[in-house]
Amino acid sequence: GEVRIREMKEMIQAIHEAGFGVIMDVVYNHTYSLDSWFQRTAPWYFYRVFPDGTVSNGSACGNDVASEREMCAKYILESVLYWTEEYHIDGFRFDLMGLLDVDLMNRIRKELDLRYGEGKKIIYGEPWAAEKTAVEGSKKLAAKENIGLLNKNIGAFCDSTRDGIKG
């Protein structure tokens, strides 16, 4: 509870005092179970579903969130801003960023830049997904094929990039 929150804040402060930054690994692309607060709050709004009713599982780990829907995007953005403001997080590594949409990732980058200065907070992620996802409409995902649509201060890495560099 409360003690753990204080301990985490003290840990981050000590890391900063030692001259290091803190990058938080975030998994916003899916939830483990459909028995979530998202589903309890607004059934099926926060999740991607294929036309046949199958819940999208592009992460191969759970249920894909619909980042292209406004309230889902708002939740993710406000969560990132909260961690940054309240805990002084220096950056974020987005797990399976390729399941989140380009507009949301650029919006996160823009908000962090407005509050802290251009590129002062680190953003990078995995520009891929394990499986196909049921993204709505013409929304573009923050996947390898759309890297050029992301803000220049959003980094990406994956096995194929690593292998290309290694040769």
Name each model feature, range by range.
Residues 18, 96-167:
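Active-site-proximal helices and loops of the catalytic beta/alpha 8
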Residues 1-87, 97, 101-116, 122, ...:
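Substrate-binding/active-site clefts of carbohydrate-active enzymes
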